[in-house]
Amino acid sequence: MNIVHTIKDVKSIIKKWKDENLSIGYVPTMGYLHEGHASLIKKAREENDKVIVSIFVNPIQFGPKEDYSTYPRDLDKDSSLCEKFGADLVFNPETSEMYPNKIYSHVNVDILTENLCGEKRPVHFQGVCTVLTKFFNILNPTKAYFGEKDAQQLTVVKKMVEDLNFPIEIIGCPIIREEDGLAKSSRNAYLNKQERKSALILNKSLKEALKSLKSGEKDLNIIKNIIINTIMKEPLAKIDYISIVDSTTLQPVEKLQSSILIAIAVYIGKTRLIDNFTFKL
């Protein structure tokens, strides 16, 4: 497995692969990799001749009061995981490589970014879409792999690729959880022992909502209140948002319909965690 840090070097390798007509699977990450990322790499390995993982903590998708400077980083550990699960190449550029000058061009996806994390983190998806556009242009992958834990991101990226005619297939992969149900996240590393225990309230609240839906409850206000009331029992938890939206348009819905996404963001102490599930009639 190779690790490269410059656009010139990564393009040189990719040109050789393309000349041999090899398919390329791409897994974009910000590093501090876990089993969720591993599942994406494994899926890419199964479906492509070559696999690239990018590791880049993208500054332009963080707001001024967010955790860019403290976001966990461990390239050695990440590289070992990438190699273990079948990556051929790790692209780990410096910020100055991706943004050598002040950036004036940005990619925005409207409507789909109005709610959920897009509402709470105003610059986030502009930063995500801009950096992914750069990576897609640099790496020219056949397929790119994203986790369903970031459900809004997955929907936004699919729409961006469709609208801008990128010749890339976007693949969504299931949420990977700890044995006790907590969704795998790099930010779980911020949690102390008590917070880690308290974080289970996210999955617990969603399970209660799903149980009620499966029992025939159709009133989405009742479903939302089940989630709120469950989370409020946990003293360390502070709700950022609870949203019930159409799983395709990400617009709020008031009545149960064919496919809904229930997504939540909750602060456990100072750490913001997200989780979700899709329910289909």
UniProtKB/Swiss-Prot annotation:
Top-level EC class as recorded in UniProt: ligase
Subunit relationships: Homodimer.
Binding site residues for beta-alanine: 61
Major localization class: cytoplasm
Keywords: ATP-binding, Cytoplasm, Ligase, Nucleotide-binding, Pantothenate biosynthesis
Keyword Cytoplasm: yes
Family: Belongs to the pantothenate synthetase family.
Pathway: Cofactor biosynthesis; (R)-pantothenate biosynthesis; (R)-pantothenate from (R)-pantoate and beta-alanine: step 1/1
Physiological role: Catalyzes the condensation of pantoate with beta-alanine in an ATP-dependent reaction via a pantoyl-adenylate intermediate.
Residues involved in ATP binding: 30-37, 147-150, 176, 184-187
SS bond partners: none
Positions contributing to (R)-pantoate binding: 61, 153
GO cellular component, one term: cytosol
Catalytic residue list: 37
Superkingdom: Bacteria
CDD domains xref list: PanC
EC code: 6.3.2.1
Name the UniProt record assigns to this protein: Pantothenate synthetase
Additional facts recorded: The reaction proceeds by a bi uni uni bi ping pong mechanism.
Molecular function as annotated in GO: ATP binding; pantoate-beta-alanine ligase activity
Localisation per UniProt entry: Cytoplasm
Catalyses which reaction(s): (R)-pantoate + beta-alanine + ATP = (R)-pantothenate + AMP + diphosphate + H(+)
Xref: Pfam families: Pantoate_ligase
